[in-house]
């Protein structure tokens, strides 16, 4: 654990130093892009390249920062129905099928749970899903949420990589959503997994365990 914490501290220092160097480059080149002395001249292409590269580097460093700076976990009894209702409000164009059985509350971090479920549903929507099914079951050992969607199925070779940091099949994706979500679940004493077999009638099922 101490080794992991040391690496996290080192990463925080490095990201801070890199951002200190990149931010002024990004600001200065952005200012020059619209100026008369650059626009339409041979300099414009070079400055645009520097600006785009600095923006990409900033986004990459920010992704690393998110991976190493999980907020403090605040476990409390949260209203599961309210959590799901908030998701439905965020994605009104999806058709929702909800079966929470007798699971009314979860002992979890509210903001983390919201982000985890939002990441899962966001990915489903981006994969072309039209239907989302959320079911909850409680046993003596744990509470399990299953989130299923009918979007484009995840290929077997991709399924092995979905929780790997920075792995993405999207042209503009950062590849940290599911990895960060799993970290959040583990920080709460739970887990996030991709089911080997999707629920009947759906293409993909994620399982949240607490």
Predicted ranges, named:
Residues 28, 41-93:
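Conserved DHp (HisKA) dimerization/phosphotransfer helix of two-component histidine kinases, i.e.
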Residues 69-73, 105-108, 169:
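Conserved micro-motifs of the catalytic ATP-binding
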Residues 177, 181:
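Short alpha-helical Gxxx[C/S/T] motif in the catalytic ATP-binding
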Residues 185-186:
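Detector for a conserved hydrophobic position within an alpha-helical segment of the HATPase_c
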Residues 154-165:
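Short conserved segment of the HATPase_c
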Residues 97-105, 111:
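Conserved catalytic submotifs in the C-terminal HATPase_c
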Residues 131-141:
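Short beta-strand/loop element within the Bergerat-fold HATPase_c
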């Amino acid at each position: 654990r101490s080794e992991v914490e040391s690496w996290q501290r080192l990463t925080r220092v490095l990201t801070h130093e890199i951002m200190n160097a990149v931010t002024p480059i990004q600001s200065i080149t952005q200012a020059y892009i619209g100026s008369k002395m650059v626009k339409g001249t041979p300099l414009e292409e070079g400055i645009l390249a520097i600006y785009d590269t600095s923006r990409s580097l900033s986004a990459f460093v920010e992704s690393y920062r998110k991976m190493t700076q999980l907020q403090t976990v605040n476990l409390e009894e949260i209203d599961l129905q309210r959590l799901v209702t908030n998701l439905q409000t965020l994605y009104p164009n999806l058709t929702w099928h909800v079966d929470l059985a007798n699971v009314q509350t979860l002992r979890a971090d509210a903001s983390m749970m919201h982000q985890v479920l939002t990441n899962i549903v966001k990915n489903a929507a981006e994969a072309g899903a039209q239907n989302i099914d959320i079911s909850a079951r409680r046993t003596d050992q744990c509470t399990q949420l299953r989130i299923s969607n009918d979007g484009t199925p995840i290929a077997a070779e991709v399924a092995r990589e979905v929780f790997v940091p920075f792995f993405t099949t999207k042209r503009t994706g950062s590849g940290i959503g599911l990895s960060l979500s799993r970290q959040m679940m583990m920080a709460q004493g739970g887990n996030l997994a991709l089911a080997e077999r999707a629920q009947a009638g759906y293409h993909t099922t994620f399982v949240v365990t607490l």
